Regions:
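Phosphopantetheine-dependent thiolation modules in NRPS/PKS and related acyl-activating systems
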Residues: 1-34, 38-44, 48-76
């Protein structure tokens, strides 16, 4: 798994936010479109694409897409 692929998969969970808004340093909860529903979609994407289970509490513990990526990598 590579960071760019993870960022793209993460960005695909959003409908209205421009792709240019997403990079490893993006503080995703600061995005206007962020919601608990998108959070669930992100958890589901990680489970399906990477076969990794991230809890809602773990998702809340990270601030950036890179931090979430690192969390996923440590669980592999």
């Amino acid at each position: 798994m590579e960071m760019q692929e993870f960022v793209a998969n993460f960005a695909n969970q959003f409908d209205d936010t421009e792709l240019e808004m997403f990079n490893s340093e993006t503080r995703f909860r600061d995005l206007e479109e962020w919601s608990s529903l998108i959070g669930l979609a992100v958890l589901n994407m990680i489970a399906k694409k990477y076969d990794i289970k991230i809890t809602p509490a773990e998702l809340r513990s990270v601030e950036t897409i890179e931090a979430l990526y690192n969390l996923v990598v440590t669980k592999k």
